[in-house]
Amino acid sequence: MNATRVSQLKNQRQSLRAGRGRKHPRWQFLRGFIKHPVMVGSIIPSSKILIEKMLKPVDWQNTKLFVEYGPGVGTFTRPILEKMAPDAKLIAIDTNQDFIDYLADDIDDDRFIAVHGSAADVEAIIRDHGFDHADYILSGLPFSTLPPGVGDAIAAATGRAIRDGGAFLVYQFSPKVRDFIAPHFEKIDRGFEWINVPPATLFWAYRQRQH
């Protein structure tokens, strides 16, 4: 067997080992749900129809910083990157190190930043990356099942972190999230998407500060 053939076989074996080592995103999502059920909204990733409906109001041309809470395995992350401008940034924040490691390894995009941390610290996180405010923040975190005080802290920090005219995009399986976000946003639009498991309530909460 010549040296070229030996090298090809070696590369094939290495590729197969790498493939076996990489977890399928659905398995990774299920694993994250089992380890942190309070922090993951659903055992099944969001549908494509829900994703498009949730992101439809975004003004992508004027978006420089988009932040995502609880990205999981990137169900929303990838569509956001597809829609973003070349000079924009996406910061994904998750308390689950497994999800952050998976995304950092799986997504090769200079615009993407994966952060292991709490959404309650969003103001410090965006400052650490050179921004004063976010244009949009997206969340699928289950506010109604978060530990006491955490949901309120996240909602308040989010209200302060979003620029005037920006919005907090929230998809939930309980409408109670409105109680958390209403004190911090001047306008809230609401929708619903049946084609998702489970069906989800959607909120678009806008910052319209008085000058």
Task: Tell where the protein language model's regions lie, with residue ranges.
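Class I SAM-dependent methyltransferase Rossmann-like catalytic core
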Residues: 28-61
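Conserved class I S-adenosyl-L-methionine
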Residues: 63-72
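Conserved SAM-binding loop of SAM-dependent methyltransferases across substrates and taxa
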Residues: 73-85
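Conserved SAM-binding motif I beta-strand of class I
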Residues: 89-94
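S-adenosyl-L-methionine
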Residues: 100-128
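A short glycine-rich, Lys/Arg-flanked "PGG" loop and its adjoining helix->strand segment in the class I
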Residues: 152-164
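Conserved beta-strand signature within the Rossmann-like core of class I S-adenosyl-L-methionine
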Residues: 164-172
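Core SAM-dependent methyltransferase catalytic element
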Residues: 193-211
